[in-house]
A protein has these predicted regions:
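Single conserved hydrophobic/aromatic residue that forms the stacking wall/gate
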Residues: 1-7, 11
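Substrate-binding/catalytic subdomain of NAD(P)-dependent oxidoreductase enzymes
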Residues: 132-133, 141-254
């Protein structure tokens, strides 16, 4: 499904009941061997169907990160059902679009390695914003630019709140063998909490009031030859997300545009962490990642 209402629209045109239950029953009723349900929505309702599909021997490929970042017991149950039924629940594109991050972590774990630390820039939107901010382009304008370039959500507060990054970090931590909930992640945000209240229109009216403070801080940063990066970190089982200042010798310093980067420190890669870097957002690379998951099932 390419959006939460896509199947419903088809059913309505055919004069059929368009409820989730009908969609579920029809897909299961097809009883097609080696079938795959692909979810490219951001719908919690669609994600709630995964359990039934897996129990009926239907593999699930999800760009939708809601299920994998939901309550740990739900995540664990989906993985367990998939294993018991001999089908796949794959969600590589939940983190880093088409970058091979989750598969790499799985390969390390399955080969006997242990993930000691994860440090990453996982928001293409926020990286774009902090790469664009300058003396000529104030903070509020960079947010609008990210929206115009379709990097951000229609409501950019979703990106600025760090919620999307928290979900991604939770997914990576779980795949690395850590039991983590979204509520366990420490947040160090750069926009005051009251900016996330009220209407979107109110937000756009108020956000220019932050420009002067950001410019003053940016000037200090420039003199120190540092860059801002919104970093997700997992170490010793503790997780956090927040804005950091990184110097020229840091691997995150030169990260361009809306790219993502992840450093994996493991028992094997302890002195020199494994680094994965590249496009972390965009329809093309995300579609390629979804297709790769589908093909990995087709080739089983």
């Amino acid at each position: 499904l390419d959006r939460s209402s896509a199947a419903s629209d088809v059913y309505k045109r055919q004069g059929k009941d368009s409820s989730l239950q009908t969609i579920r029953d029809e897909i299961i009723g097809m009883n097609i061997f080696n079938s795959v349900f692909v979810d490219c929505t951001a719908s919690a309702d669609i994600a709630s169907l995964y359990k039934d599909f897996l129990q009926h021997n239907i593999s699930v490929v999800a760009a939708n990160k809601i299920a994998a970042s939901s309550a740990y017991e739900n995540y664990r149950e989906l993985k367990t059902i998939a294993r018991q039924r001999g089908v796949k629940y794959l969600f590589e594109t939940n983190v880093g679009a088409g970058l091979p991050i989750i598969n790499t972590i799985n390969d390390l774990i399955h080969s006997g390695d242990k993930i000691l630390k994860i440090e990453a820039v996982l928001s293409g939107t926020l990286n774009y914003i902090f790469n664009k901010i300058s003396a000529d382009i104030p903070f509020s304008r960079t947010i609008k630019m990210a929206q115009e370039e379709r990097y951000s959500e229609p409501d950019p507060r979703i990106d600025l709140s760090g919620k999307d990054v928290i979900r991604k970090l939770v997914i990576l931590a779980r795949e690395a063998g850590y039991r983590l909930e979204q509520e366990d992640v420490e947040k160090n945000l750069f926009v005051p909490n009251d900016f996330f209240e009220g209407s979107l229109e109110d937000f756009w009216k108020r956000v220019p009031s932050l420009d002067a403070d950001f410019e003053a801080r940016r000037q200090v940063l420039e003199k120190e030859n540092k860059h801002w990066r919104f970093v997700a970190k997992l170490e010793n089982g503790k997780a956090s997300v927040g804005l950091q200042e990184v110097g020229a010798n840091h691997p995150f310093y030169g990260l361009e545009g809306s790219n993502n980067i992840i450093l994996l420190t493991t028992e094997r890669y302890k002195e020199y962490p494994m680094m994965i870097q590249g496009y972390g957002a965009g329809a093309g690379v995300t579609a390629a990642g979804v297709f790769a998951d589908i093909m990995s099932i087709a080739n089983v």
